[in-house]
Amino acid sequence: MTIWKKVFTLEQLNEMGKDCAIGHLGIEISAYGENWIEAKMPVDHRTTQPFGLLHGGVSVALAETIGSLAGFLSIEEGQIALGLDINANHLRPVKQGFVTAKATPIALSQNTHVWQIDIRDEQDKLCCVSRLTLYIKHL
């Protein structure tokens, strides 16, 4: 059974982010299932630090992007998801290619969501783990 409360297509989701940080970083929503959603991002001049490695802050931006989107898609109309906390552990460097972030729920309640975001490289090696907590505000 799906957790998604909104009807969407990947094209619609990618259109939403094209003129903001999501688009500038090259983040693309790439796949979803009944209780997970993924985004991919290039490791290139936009996303690396001066030593040519994926910037840790950009990994966190990717995690917050896909986790916040997951929260938005899994709440009812008349609610908004607001970030309360995010943390990340950077496990291995990435020099090139793409990384993929997959968000899955840890806990979904009426007022709080906790999402696990795993970021993997093209060899499916875990590069970063992140946890995002969202406050669900009822309008």
Residue ranges and their predicted role:
Residues 1-139:
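Terminal targeting signals and extreme-terminal segments of soluble enzymes
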